[in-house]
């Protein structure tokens, strides 16, 4: 274990240069503030218009519709104000890793990396070990680095894959160090260099292919090679004959011990599958993280912890030193609890078909959150101080390191007890210690409580992305993922940890509003749904909802629409996107709010009423071959029956029928007045155009990725029924 003199001391203490710099771009921010002020003035004018016109020569139905539109536009305006908090004070962090090297040399703090997986089918073992191998080769002293794999599936196959990775690491890590390999994931590196490998790389590639073949063969056959069971008998013997993924004891195996005093020049590598029993709630990923915190404290006890999802491989091995520049800075770093990197992906199509990158979020909004006190903790790509995530408040003295109080030869059974399903009973784990329980987005609520204890966080988004993962490759996966996020964020809003009252007086108003941007995703579904439906139905019925184009009151409506759209496009292009990418982003904005967020809202309400419980849904990391080809060609994938698809299909067909009826009326000259209904034509027309991939999937395509016929029929019937009923009102 760590000796008492193994403290982090600067090699050159007289060197007072900061390890990072924080910069602001005041000119651009001031210009944006003027722009946002002009938009807000027009929003207020829209409200005044709605109030002033609500009683003018209207039927009861007209007044009701007008009032609903007014309420919805109040929500849009107030939510827009909330979103400005993440744009008014952006900051950029610039680490100086060369200064870190001069000041500390190799005397860096111990770093424990937590990689979490839960299902060997959805998260293939070969993908998992590529992530593990990528972090074993980080630009960091190997004796100070430990990698822990938490396998919540309790899979022998995953353990076998890790044993293979441990053997391959003996070749891979020295190779990476010698040739400065980037990225350090074998699969990513070898695929990027497939046509230009030298002899050394060819030998490594051969060993990797052999390892991959053994792992994939074991996965396909569903059994572990007998020689592996013999070689790693201590590990495999920990599985009971009747063990299942939901019912098994703690399995702990140190596959590589790379601590000081050992001859192996690769990091420590540990496998952990915590105990699970049907009668005990396991608290999903949060429970796995807390088990890792306790177990690692008795093995390596790194002062810094990096946690990664099993698909997020290290793309930039220098990112670790960049994070330490923030955390070890003698002046400003002492108030930073965690450093968050963005969640980026290596399988996103050129035009980001499903809006997975969330470009504006990582390149704009998180910079603004950083300026207000720090970004959210998003559950992956984050460097934590161990004592802070375990409960230390800002200003409290740092406790003696756990590793200084424990013995080298602590019995494995004593360590395994820390991962038992009963260990946390009558303790503060999941409450005041570790990752919080009781919420589908345990990461966000954990980061919020850390910041409310007086700490700040920092955001780093280097030019070379630090970590890359696997984005959803079909629409259903994306919607399910967003449903869980929106549900969890809304649960936070309604809980005792709501940033509005829990954060009051503890974090800045700007950061409170920044959290509210995400916590209000779910309820924002209702105004969007109402607005899109009412606009189309009133166009169908010939009821005007907006001022005439010739009226001066049209100006604020037109300005807000054009200005917001133009700025959104410019912002997206500035973030490195394409026009088609922006258009795809707008489509996903609509789909998320009318399906994922809507169901997230309903799930939260049902949970509050005691009707249902939250569930943690794992996003699949692989796709079948035909679906993968369609994804590469940017063809939208439906393929499964889903209530969310039924909502999207019904709304899409409703927009189409209403627009077609209005155009027919306009062409025939029977009550179609563009001057009166112009804005409704534009809004409904845009909805029809943006839904073109949906219509293709429902009506034109014949491949397996099309919309299921049952969903199409139900959608058409529901949309026609709505139009028919409205026609007789």
Swiss-Prot record:
Keywords: Cell wall biogenesis/degradation, Glycosyltransferase, Golgi apparatus, Membrane, Transferase, Transmembrane, Transmembrane helix. GO terms for cellular component: endoplasmic reticulum; Golgi membrane; nucleus. It is a multi-pass membrane protein. Its EC number is 2.4.1.-. The keyword Lyase does not apply. The active site is at residues 152, 443. It is an enzyme of class 2 (transferase). It is found in: Golgi apparatus membrane. One of its GO terms (molecular function) is cellulose synthase (UDP-forming) activity. InterPro entries: Cellulose_synth, Nucleotide-diphossugar_trans. Gene3D superfamilies: Spore Coat Polysaccharide Biosynthesis Protein SpsA, Chain A (3.90.550.10). Its main location: Golgi. The chain crosses the membrane at residues 29-49, 64-84, 526-546, 553-573, 644-664, 680-700, 709-729. Belongs to the glycosyltransferase 2 family. Plant cellulose synthase-like E subfamily. This is Cellulose synthase-like protein E1. It comes from Arabidopsis thaliana (Mouse-ear cress).
